[in-house]
């Protein structure tokens, strides 16, 4: 039986779908982060396998392009011993006009156990979760501007790995926040986990004003936004989602909001720099920072496998 207040949870408060971080209790987030820690060592084994999803079929449905997310989901499922099916959307019946729900119905008839879904339309994973059988689980791998919960969780794992505790942290999220599903997921996770201060930093055209109602400090000046920050999360400009001229030029944007070593010096000396990728060097961040000692961008990718293993194994073990 589903939880009437949150479709991601069953009546016992256990996670059965991961659709958004918003509304999830701190205990659920902490459980996933703790579980991810136990899976991290699997990456270093000679045989990188555990049998938790043996006999289960995981369908990766990516209606938008992806490198890191799709690959790490596939690796994570295979390391859990699942059978992984990657649907080629461009060559599928979807490209011939088949509806999303008809596609899901047909794949469900093939005894799918889990759908990992990335879609351009916000809410698509919610729609799928409403129409699958009780034993089938749905993981949101990014839907429109709405949410990217596994990226949010791996960002939280990265922060916890390097900073241990959220309670005294100042976290600055810099860039195209208005179009970013990662920013939304990170903000919900950070506030739930008790970060001391969350800042949204960017030009007025790219930072939603309503973030203030979520307890987020909005800064339109880069120096103010990253001063004394413990964590800086850089975001790319999502030009594919922009409908008009929101910025004068990429060069002007970099001058005002690009992270350079000079600007990074305003943050705390032990601050870490994160980025969900893909990175546009020289637009939102300088190469010297990407490759510098404070960058933890590549460890984020490594942690992503363990976090996605934790998500899939957690929801697969819970029944609706």
Swiss-Prot record:
MF terms in GO: amino acid binding; aspartate carbamoyltransferase activity
**Record-annotated residues binding L-aspartate?**
96, 181, 236
The family database entries (Gene3D superfamilies) matched by this protein are listed as: Aspartate/ornithine carbamoyltransferase (3.40.50.1370)
**Disulphide bonds in the chain:** none
Gene Ontology terms, cellular component aspect? cytosol
Would you identify the family this protein belongs to, as annotated?
Belongs to the aspartate/ornithine carbamoyltransferase superfamily. ATCase family.
Functional note: Catalyzes the condensation of carbamoyl phosphate and aspartate to form carbamoyl aspartate and inorganic phosphate, the committed step in the de novo pyrimidine nucleotide biosynthesis pathway.
Question: Which HAMAP family does this entry report, sorted A to Z?
Answer: Asp_carb_tr (MF_00001)
For this protein, the record's NCBIfam families field holds: asp_carb_tr, PRK00856.1
Q: What is this protein called?
A: Aspartate carbamoyltransferase catalytic subunit
* Upper taxonomic lineage: Bacteria, Pseudomonadati, Pseudomonadota, Betaproteobacteria, Burkholderiales
Q: Which gene encodes it?
A: pyrB
């Amino acid at each position: 039986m589903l939880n009437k207040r949150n479709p991601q949870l069953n009546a016992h408060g256990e996670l059965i779908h991961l659709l958004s971080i918003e509304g999830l209790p701190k205990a659920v987030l902490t459980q996933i982060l703790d579980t991810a820690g136990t899976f991290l060592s699997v990456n270093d084994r000679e045989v990188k396998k555990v049998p938790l999803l043996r006999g289960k079929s995981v369908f990766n449905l990516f209606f938008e392009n992806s490198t890191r997310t799709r690959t790490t989901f596939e690796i994570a499922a295979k390391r859990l011993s699942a059978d992984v099916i990657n649907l080629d959307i461009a060559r599928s019946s979807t490209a011939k006009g088949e509806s999303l729900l008809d596609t899901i119905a047909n794949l469900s008839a093939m005894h799918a156990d889990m759908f990992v879904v990335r879609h351009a339309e916000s809410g698509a994973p919610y729609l799928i979760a409403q129409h699958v059988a009780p034993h089938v689980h749905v993981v949101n791998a990014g839907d429109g501007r709405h949410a990217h919960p596994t990226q949010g969780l791996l960002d939280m794992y990265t922060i916890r790995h390097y900073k241990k505790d959220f309670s005294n942290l100042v976290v600055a999220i810099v860039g195209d926040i208005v179009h970013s599903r990662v920013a939304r997921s990170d903000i919900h996770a950070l506030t739930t986990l008790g970060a001391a201060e969350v800042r949204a930093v960017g030009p007025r055209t790219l930072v939603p004003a309503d973030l203030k109602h979520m307890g987020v400090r909005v800064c339109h000046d880069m120096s103010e936004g990253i001063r004394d920050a413990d964590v800086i999360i850089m975001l790319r400009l999502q030009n594919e989602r922009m409908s008009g001229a929101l910025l004068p030029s990429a060069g002007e944007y970099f001058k005002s909001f690009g992270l350079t070593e000079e600007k990074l010096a305003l943050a705390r000396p032990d601050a870490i720099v994160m980025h969900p990728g893909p990175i546009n060097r020289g637009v939102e961040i300088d190469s010297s920072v990407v490759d510098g000692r404070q960058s933890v961008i590549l460890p984020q990718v490594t942690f992503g496998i363990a976090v996605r293993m934790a998500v899939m194994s957690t929801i697969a073990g819970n029944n609706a």
